[in-house]
């Protein structure tokens, strides 16, 4: 039959997929501490409702930042809005390429007009102090070796066969592969968001059923797990480990319920087995305050945690909040009612399809 020879044109994803794509797109901005504007959230709602297409969302957001109101927004809010739209667009596509060129294409697609170096490999070496490493840095790839290292990693992955592997073995391999790509850190900024988009698309390409909520809810954990997968200090008995990244992927691909806590990854704490390093690693005031910042987050009140979660994921549901916060849906409802009565939050739109806003 002739119609079998026709290619189907990729259309807008269904409502459920839209929500998941937007949750991941907005949640991944939290990796760099970015939050979307209220205008962006309202425009996203219209897309989810089917009122406008994702291309129209992109056009409206671009136009918003030429208005008087948009020009008052901070550059970080502009970045959060525009990159979130672009991530959602990429996640709605079924196209994929396993190679360094496609990785650069993702970066350029996300950050064109935001970073001058969008889609271009860095020509300088970098380091970054990490909270979970107490101020130490991962050793990122030497700039002249970025392209050959990426080519090697992608060639090895292309040759690799997942046939006859158990899910545990697949998760271990995927964790190491993704960690290796991230360690190269080929771009000046935006590496984790680029890696996350690439990873989601690759897993779908392999045939895995991927729900993006785990990336949305645990974007900082994802980055810190990548950090721990690429840091070692033999003097203090610290070895690079994909253990934490495997927990993330086991939740994603095997529907496990591993607890994903950033504090577990801090080197030299009682949360992990490297307690012997606690006395050996020098603790500058900066490192101490950084660790206290992570530990303080675990002592937040329930309402503070709910507000933080809503700020990161405005389209979250009561059920999702209950799961993240660790209390019953009824308990979440009571807390939300208290916050609404106190004038701290409001719900915009219908019960099932609306979003939360924080009243500053």
Residue ranges and their predicted role:
Residues 1-360:
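FIC/Doc superfamily catalytic core
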């Amino acid at each position: 039959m002739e119609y079998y020879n026709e290619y189907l044109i990729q259309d807008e994803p269904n409502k459920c997929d839209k929500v998941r794509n937007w949750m991941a797109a907005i949640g991944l901005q939290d990796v760099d501490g970015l939050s979307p504007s209220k205008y962006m959230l309202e425009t996203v709602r219209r897309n989810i409702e089917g009122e406008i297409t994702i291309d129209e969302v992109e056009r409206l957001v671009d136009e918003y930042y030429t208005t008087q109101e948009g020009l008052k927004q901070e550059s970080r809010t502009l970045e959060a809005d525009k990159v979130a739209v672009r991530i959602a667009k990429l996640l709605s596509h079924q196209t994929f390429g396993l190679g360094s060129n496609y990785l650069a294409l993702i970066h350029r697609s996300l950050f064109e007009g935001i970073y001058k170096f969008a889609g271009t490999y860095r020509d300088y070496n970098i380091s970054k102090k990490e909270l979970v490493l107490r101020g130490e840095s991962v050793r990122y790839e030497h700039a002249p070796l970025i392209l050959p290292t990426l080519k090697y990693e992608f060639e090895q992955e292309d040759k690799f066969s997942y046939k006859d592997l158990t899910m545990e073995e697949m998760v271990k391999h995927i964790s190491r592969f993704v960690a290796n790509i991230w360690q190269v850190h080929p771009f000046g900024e935006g590496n984790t968001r680029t890696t996350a988009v690439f990873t989601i698309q690759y897993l779908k390409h392999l045939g895995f059923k991927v729900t993006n909520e785990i990336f949305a809810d645990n974007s900082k954990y994802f980055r810190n797990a990548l950090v721990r997968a690429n840091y070692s200090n033999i003097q203090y008995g610290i070895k690079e480990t994909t253990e934490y990244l495997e927990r993330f992927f086991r939740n994603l691909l095997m529907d496990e319920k591993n607890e994903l806590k950033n504090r577990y990854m801090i080197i030299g704490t009682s949360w992990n087995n490297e307690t012997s390093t606690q006395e050996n690693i020098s603790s500058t005031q900066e490192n101490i305050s950084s660790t206290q910042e992570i530990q303080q987050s675990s002592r937040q009140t329930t309402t503070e945690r709910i507000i933080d979660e809503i700020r990161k994921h405005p389209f979250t549901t009561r059920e999702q909040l209950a799961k993240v916060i660790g209390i019953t849906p009824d308990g979440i409802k009571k807390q939300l009612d208290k916050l609404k009565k106190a004038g701290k939050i409001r719900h915009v739109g219908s019960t099932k399809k609306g979003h939360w806003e924080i009243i500053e």
